[in-house]
From Swiss-Prot:
Entry keyword set: Aminoacyl-tRNA synthetase, ATP-binding, Cytoplasm, Ligase, Nucleotide-binding, Protein biosynthesis
Native species: Lysinibacillus sphaericus (strain C3-41)
NCBIfam families with a match to the protein in the record: aspS_bact (TIGR00459), PRK00476.1 (NF001750)
Main location: cytoplasm
InterPro entries: Aa-tRNA-synt_II, aa-tRNA-synth_II, aa-tRNA-synth_II/BPL/LPL, Asp-tRNA-ligase_1, Asp-tRNA-ligase_1_N, Asp/Asn-tRNA-synth_IIb, AspRS_core, GAD-like_sf
Reactions catalysed, as given in the entry: tRNA(Asp) + L-aspartate + ATP = L-aspartyl-tRNA(Asp) + AMP + diphosphate
Functional note: Catalyzes the attachment of L-aspartate to tRNA(Asp) in a two-step reaction: L-aspartate is first activated by ATP to form Asp-AMP and then transferred to the acceptor end of tRNA(Asp).
Subunit structure, as described in the record: Homodimer.
Protein name: Aspartate--tRNA ligase
EC id: 6.1.1.12
Region entry Aspartate, spans: 199-202
GO molecular function, one term: ATP binding
Binding site for L-aspartate: E175, R221, H449, R490
Length: 589
């Protein structure tokens, strides 16, 4: 085989008359009455190669090649005639006149066409993932992913950060999701866990005095999957010592600006918008709001207190909430049947109903309009900024149901009404989170983020009297309605960390067994430290305009956490189980 001289994207009319050697895959072959044309594909693009009967040996071989054959061609770059120019490809003004053809390898007929547009099932694509990855759109996504990680590394190293790898085989600790467990052959009956995050190790690196750490970290969580979750994923993990929260946010803003400029050619203004957790929930019904469009939630308790509409008045009297969204100018777009469908939709999120009113020239119109006297209607219209042609939708329930149902409805309406500018990247910090979440079902508190998050110093006394009122020095970075990542200032005193464990239901013995190494480390001069981690897979998904996390992971798992290509997970031999002192309980498939 000859040495390849050029890739497809390196060919242009400036090379007219030059001899080149190209290698790649046959995308398409066409026989046009003597002349044979082959579209040769490599990872950079497609080049048209023409075979003339005058070059008999190469022409005869070209007649036999089929799609996805791997070939090598030698030939001369020539200009296409004016009527043959293809404006849809970068090198569409030239073609290569072949003088030699070598078939490096043949190929079976592929189970689907290797083209960007394919309507085959995702399962078939995942089974033949190595073929799916040949599609240019997939290569472009992974080229972008590589560019993102390169930019991140360069930025952080220039900022003085050290890239440090932390263990993959580690100790099982309660961090929220279930651990993936790895049995130890050497220590019978004992297990390692795959890390859900490098959280404890990166804090210990701050104890060690490293001050600035980062890692492109592999993480594992055995949890129920959805479109934007995978059992194994990659996060950009960062930890620093001696920085304030504002300094951490500012540094990460500059990191994101660098990525957006390098990878997308977009200048993102900073500082990013900041919004406290409670404000986000009040205005958007979500802790990760998409702020590219309006449709904000409006609180109406004061409007409906003691009003003639008993459903709303009773809700207010019970200490619950009534909120509304004004769908501007949508009265003509939603029929009664459409509103019934929206009512079913909010029911998924616990709402018992969706009340609605249309604003007409004659006043309010809809199923509940008869309960609104002139004064109440005027007060509502003023509060909602309503005009003729608007629809007002209402949910009345406890705060969590109102937020969940109207927050989800807001997102649906934004999509259905085409209100979202898909070209926009709206970054947002959500700050001042609650430190704890209380589970009525379990009758206990859980950490809203993780057990190592630092409370506001002025809220520490509330840990003994009103834990639900304690605010966390935590921050999430949100992009276009997706939680991109999050971080916090950390606890760095042993007594405060022990108090945190106590409130989370750990006995002193349990805390020592699970986290004794961390508690002891906190007795050896620990600096204040803070950090952040964001999901690389999700970041690339959003930058690439993809809608599925699996499209940004080379060999992903399905929604059932299986690999259709390798058929993992799979059974192992009795001998392997015996070595690990394991036995499988009988079960039904």
């Amino acid at each position: 085989m000859a040495t390849r001289t050029h890739a497809s994207n390196e060919l242009s009319e400036t090379l007219q008359g030059e001899k080149v050697v190209l290698k790649g895959w046959v995308q398409r072959r066409r026989d046009l009455g003597g002349l044979i044309f082959i579209d040769l594909r490599d990872r950079t693009g497609i080049t048209q190669v023409v075979f003339s009967p005058d070059v008999a040996e190469a022409h005869a071989l070209a007649d036999k090649v089929r799609s996805e054959y791997v070939i090598e061609i030698e030939g001369t770059v020539i200009l296409r005639t004016e009527d043959q120019i293809n404006p849809n490809v970068p090198n569409g003004k030239i073609e290569v006149e072949a003088t030699r053809l070598v078939v490096i390898n043949t190929a079976k007929t592929t189970p689907f066409q290797i083209e960007d547009r394919t309507d085959v099932s995702e399962d078939l694509r995942l089974k033949y993932r190595y073929l799916d990855l040949r599609r240019p759109v997939m290569f472009d996504t992974f080229k972008m992913r590589s560019d993102v990680t390169r930019t991140i590394r360069n930025f952080l190293q220039n900022e003085g950060f050290l890239e440090v790898e932390t263990p993959i085989l580690t100790k099982s600790t309660p961090e929220g999701a279930r651990d993936y467990l790895v049995p130890s052959r050497v220590h019978e009956g004992e297990f390692y866990a795959l890390p859900q995050s490098p959280q404890l190790f990166k804090q210990l690196l701050m104890v060690a005095g490293f001050e600035k750490y980062f890692q492109i970290a592999r993480c594992f969580r055995d949890e129920d999957l959805r479109a934007d979750r995978q059992p194994e994923f990659t996060q950009v993990d960062i930890e620093t010592s001696f920085l304030t929260q504002e300094e951490v946010l500012e540094m990460n803003e500059r990191l994101i600006q660098a990525v957006m400029k390098e990878v997308k050619g977009i200048d993102i203004p900073a500082p990013f918008q900041r919004m406290k957790y409670q404000e986000a929930m009040d205005r958007y019904g979500s802790d990760k709001p998409d702020v590219r469009f309006g449709l904000e939630l409006v609180a109406l308790n004061d409007v409906f207190e003691g009003c003639g509409f008993k459903v709303f008045a009773d809700t207010v009297a019970q200490g619950k909430q009534v909120k509304s969204i004004n769908i501007k100018g949508a009265a003509d777009k939603y029929s009664r049947k459409d509103m019934d469908e929206l009512t079913k939709f909010v029911g998924i999120y616990g709402a018992k109903g969706l009340a609605w009113l249309k604003v007409t020239e004659e006043g309010l119109n809809g199923p509940i309009a008869k309960f609104f006297d002139e004064a109440l209607a005027a007060a509502l219209i003023e509060r909602m900024g309503a005009e003729v042609g608007d629809i007002l939708v209402f949910v009345a329930d406890k705060a969590s149901v109102v937020a969940a149902s109207l927050g989800a409805l807001r997102t649906k309406l934004g999509q259905d009404l085409d209100l979202i500018d898909e070209s926009q990247f709206a970054f947002l910090w959500i700050t001042d989170w609650p430190l704890f979440e209380y589970s009525e079902e379990d009758g206990r508190y859980y950490a809203a983020h993780h057990p190592f998050t630092r409370p506001f110093d002025e809220d520490i006394p509330l840990m003994d009297t009103d834990p639900s009122a304690v605010r966390a020095q935590a921050y999430d970075i949100v992009l276009n309605g997706y939680e991109l990542g999050g971080g916090s200032l950390r606890i760095y005193e042993r007594d405060l960390q022990e108090k945190m464990f106590e409130l989370l239901g750990f006995s002193e013995e349990e805390a020592q067994a699970q986290f004794g190494f961390l508690l002891e480390a906190f007795e050896y001069g620990v600096p204040p430290h803070a950090g952040l981690a964001f999901g690389l897979d999700r970041f690339v998904m959003l930058l690439a305009g993809r809608h599925n996390l699996r499209d940004t992971i080379a060999f992903p798992k399905t929604a059932s956490a299986s690999c259709l290509m390798t058929e993992a997970p799979s059974e192992v031999s009795p001998e392997q189980l015996s070595e690990l002192s394991l036995a499988i309980k009988p079960f039904r498939k």
